Amino acid sequence: MRRLMVLGNLLLAAFPAAAAPPAAPDCSVPNEIVEDNPRLPELAEHLQQKHPVTIVVIGGASTAGLASGNAAEYAYPQRLAVALKQRYPGVPITVLNKGVSRQTTQEMIDRFPRDVFALAPTLVIWETGTFDAARSVDVDVFSAALTSGLAELKEHKLETMLINMQYSRSTASVINFMPYLETMQHIADVDGVYLFRRFEMMKYWAENGIFSFAEVPVERRTELAAQVYQCLADRLADAIAHAITTP
């Protein structure tokens, strides 16, 4: 129960939203955290030919963006849409946010027919694992679900990018993320899926004093969450740019 309370506090959205997107600090990270080997050739072709691009982001509470206080503006899928349109002017880009709070990997898969397949996206970004770890879902069950979900996406010929768990010192002190992180990395390597290492990225930010919820007054935490989402979106745009580049 304490794990879920800590996770809930991390994602809390009980404060008023800021009037405009707050400026994010310099949140660059080492290339090895962002870059991965798999490529996204279909997305690359769409961007090069300026064909319409639809990206579905399916995930949990952090995808929904509740902690920012204004999910419609500040959630990272919304900020990703802005970042990609700036990088690829003239390309019609739509990013659809399909985040639902407190769902396991299997519960997200159950939404695939409605929230992914029916939308025929160019790219699927799948953020998962945080709630599985918080609920201590058996790692073998988590592994089987993730493998099954990726197989379904592959059957529908959908390019996919995985996003691993969130990191904060408070959650890491009560939740053992490591088996889930290792499982995601292994499955991504075996399946040739691009893994966006959000956990390692957020840990880098925390260790380098870029973001720290513990040191910020409660009334400023929605602003900080919005900054984190902006940085995630910017780094995701970096990852996509890397993944569409021919080696």
Q: What is the predicted function of each stretch?
A:
Residues T54-V56, K85, V91-L119, V124, ...:
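Internal alpha/beta domain cores that form substrate/cofactor-binding pockets in large enzymes
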Residues E127-T130, G149-E182:
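Active-site segments of SGNH/GDSL-like serine hydrolases
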Residues A61-A64, V100-Q106, T130-R135, Q166-S170, ...:
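Solvent-exposed loop/turn segments at secondary-structure junctions
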Residues M1-R3:
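Positively charged n-region of N-terminal signal peptides that target proteins for export
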Residues R169-P247:
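Catalytic His-Asp segment of secreted/periplasmic serine-dependent ester chemistry enzymes
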Residues A24-K98, P113-A120:
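Serine-esterase "nucleophile elbow" of acetyl-processing enzymes
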